[in-house]
Amino acid sequence: MQPRRIARELALLGVNQLPATAAKLSEKQLEDLLLAAIRALSEETHETLSTAAAEIQRSDRLLHESDPLLLADSDPKEEGGSRSVTLRLHQAQRHLQRLEITLKEAKVPNPNALRGEVLELIQQVQVALSNAGQALEHLEQRLHSVRHILDEVVQLSQRAVNRVGVALSMPELLYIAQSQEVRAYALQLLTALRTHKEAIDARLQKALVGWQLQRVGRIERDILRLAVVEMEILASSPVKVAINEAVELAKKYGDPEAAAFVNGVLRRVVDSQMETHRGRDPSLPGSGSGG
């Protein structure tokens, strides 16, 4: 794992604990914020594993629920079983064979008797085919139910596997989070954000289309702020790297639409920066650099 990636994550977890007042934070206070962020990561590991276990249990329960639907096929009289459909189709086939034999052996001098027998056989075939069609509909409903259950089982299992993968990476993350390099960069991000928060928010507000920054979700808002810190204030990461890292954080901590939203806003921030590249925006000390 890259130290800076972990530092960004720690900073994101620590942002929410920054005081609302403009008072300067001491180094000790910032260190305490990072320790709280590390504890939050540890708690997240346990929660992730618990959620994965619950999803596996639900998958197992759903599979058991699908058994009666599949076992119904073993009874030829059970509506909706594949054997029931086959039985009814064979019945229709026998009626058709009888009809064929009757037509071949028909005696022309007695057309009325032939007509009556043929009509009766045709009616029997129609009934048999109708029954087979109904049985097919029942079977399709059963298969649809089973397919729906299996789809949910696959989704739950995949989520559980993903959660376990995240949890397995946590010990390494927690270990690296203790390093001086990681803590120093996280402190740098938090300090810059605390110092230039108003200017950063003004920059982001300009890039938002039809949104107010304060109405954006807290996680997404903090991710955007930290990305602007890296791109424009500290100029510590190339623009592409800062945006990509922000998108990854949004995928991990935001809702399903967060990543696309964060990417779009930051792209507009960069476009705005390029438009004013020939001059310096006085609202940001590092504006125009860090590309």
UniProtKB/Swiss-Prot annotation:
One of its GO terms (cellular component) is cytosol. The gene is nusB. InterPro entries: NusB-like_sf (IPR035926), NusB_fam (IPR011605), NusB_RsmB_TIM44 (IPR006027). It comes from Synechococcus sp. (strain JA-2-3B'a(2-13)) (Cyanobacteria bacterium Yellowstone B-Prime). Keywords: RNA-binding, Transcription, Transcription antitermination, Transcription regulation. The keyword RNA-binding applies. One of its GO terms (biological process) is transcription antitermination. Transmembrane segments: none annotated. This is Transcription antitermination protein NusB. Disulfide bonds: none annotated. PANTHER family: ANTITERMINATION NUSB DOMAIN-CONTAINING PROTEIN, N UTILIZATION SUBSTANCE PROTEIN B-RELATED. Involved in transcription antitermination. Required for transcription of ribosomal RNA (rRNA) genes. Binds specifically to the boxA antiterminator sequence of the ribosomal RNA (rrn) operons. Belongs to the NusB family.
